[in-house]
Curated annotation (Swiss-Prot):
Gene3D superfamilies: 5' to 3' exonuclease, C-terminal subdomain (1.10.150.20), DNA-directed RNA polymerase, insert domain (2.170.120.12), RNA polymerase, RBP11-like subunit (3.30.1360.10). CDD domains: RNAP_alpha_NTD. Belongs to the RNA polymerase alpha chain family. DNA-dependent RNA polymerase catalyzes the transcription of DNA into RNA using the four ribonucleoside triphosphates as substrates. Residues 1-231 are annotated as: Alpha N-terminal domain (alpha-NTD). It is an enzyme of class 2 (transferase). The N-terminal domain is essential for RNAP assembly and basal transcription, whereas the C-terminal domain is involved in interaction with transcriptional regulators and with upstream promoter elements. Its EC number is 2.7.7.6. It catalyses: RNA(n) + a ribonucleoside 5'-triphosphate = RNA(n+1) + diphosphate. This is DNA-directed RNA polymerase subunit alpha. One of its GO terms (cellular component) is cytoplasm. One of its GO terms (molecular function) is DNA-directed RNA polymerase activity.
Length: 330
């Protein structure tokens, strides 16, 4: 249904943009829509985008986070607070995490930049950040893990079973967006002056540029709002009242389509891409066509070839109509 005389922008205007800061205008908007759109995008920008951070460390001679290190000015808690601020940008396409062993000696001060030569898959974006001050005679040996994540994750959620003795799990700030501001200004269209202009200012850590950050945030919102389209809205009471019967072939297909992808022999990279897109089962997978899959973040041709083979082996096809299998019902 067309929206009668509904004023909406036809594009986003980029006023200024670097790798770290960007300013954007969205106009004209109907009265009240500046706040509606601005607040939603700001929340997603600050909490839902993926980034990279340290999730655990292991320092030689240290048993827990309340320890002190002989010859080092800062205690371990202060060192952890500094490590939480180190920002990373992925340098190698297929890497989402990396375990790093660091051995530094002969220095009075260690900065984040000193880690770079020990890291192969990521670039340190704030090399000037001071990690600790120490006696130059002290050897500083540490292992740390860099991982991909979203938003803020507390140390408790980063914990893994069977971790080595002395491993300290840290809080992780994955979000690549440092700050978001938006302002709503009056905007004139012909003789009407009560329309709105939404102005966004976005600052990132450099691992993603502001334009891409805004695009990714919009995609997150679109993915959620699509669920409210007519074909996705059903009346639960009607569904419960319906009685259904399935032939043997349909039952077999339902069972197959509900198979979890983690139970398939897929590469970690393919699984991570699908998980990020909330594609959990074979049914979820084949509901997309190949062009849709290629739009997933970090999804490449190798992953598509791998999934193409899996779908063919299972005698399925991409873009299948799954409605008759009623996968949303037990």
């Amino acid at each position: 249904m067309a929206l009668f005389n509904f004023q909406k922008p036809d594009k986003v205007i980029m006023i200024d943009s670097t790798d770290f800061e960007g300013k954007f205008e969205f106009r004209p908007l109907e009265p009240g829509y500046g706040l509606t759109v601005g607040n939603a995008l700001r929340r997603v920008l600050l909490s839902a985008l993926e980034g990279y951070a340290i999730t655990s460390i292991r320092i030689e001679g240290v048993d827990h986070e309340f320890s002190t290190i002989p010859g080092v000015v800062e205690d371990v808690t202060e060192i952890i607070l500094s490590l939480k601020q180190v920002r990373f940008k992925r340098q190698i396409e297929d890497i989402d995490n990396e375990s790093v062993t660091i051995a530094i000696s002969g220095k009075n001060q260690i900065t984040a930049g000193d880690f770079q030569k020990y890291i192969s898959g990521f670039q340190v974006l704030n090399p000037e950040l001071v990690i600790c001050n120490l006696d130059s005679k002290v050897n500083f040996n540490m292992e740390m893990t860099i991982e991909k994540g979203r938003g803020y994750v507390p140390a408790e959620e980063n914990k893994k079973q069977n971790a080595a003795i002395g491993t300290i799990f840290t809080d992780s700030i994955f979000t690549p967006v440092k700050n978001v501001k938006y302002a709503i200004e009056n905007f004139r269209v012909e003789q009407k002056t009560d329309y709105e202009k939404l102005v966004f200012e976005i600052k990132t850590d450099g691992s993603i540029n502001p334009k891409d950050a805004l695009t990714e945030a919009a995609k997150v919102l679109i993915h959620h709002f699509m669920l409210f389209s007519d074909e996705r809205i059903t009346l639960e009471a009607d569904e419960i009242a319906q009685t259904e019967s399935y032939d043997e072939e349909s039952l077999h297909m339902r069972q197959l389509l509900k198979t979890k992808l983690v139970d398939m022999d897929l590469s970690v990279r393919a699984l991570n891409c699908l998980k990020a897109a909330e594609v959990d089962t074979l049914g979820d997978l084949v509901s997309f066509n190949k062009n849709d899959l290629m739009k997933f973040r970090n999804f490449g041709k190798k992953s598509l070839t791998e999934l193409d083979e899996l779908v063919a082996i299972k005698n399925l096809t991409f873009g299948m109509d799954l409605a008759k299998y009623k996968l949303d019902k037990e």
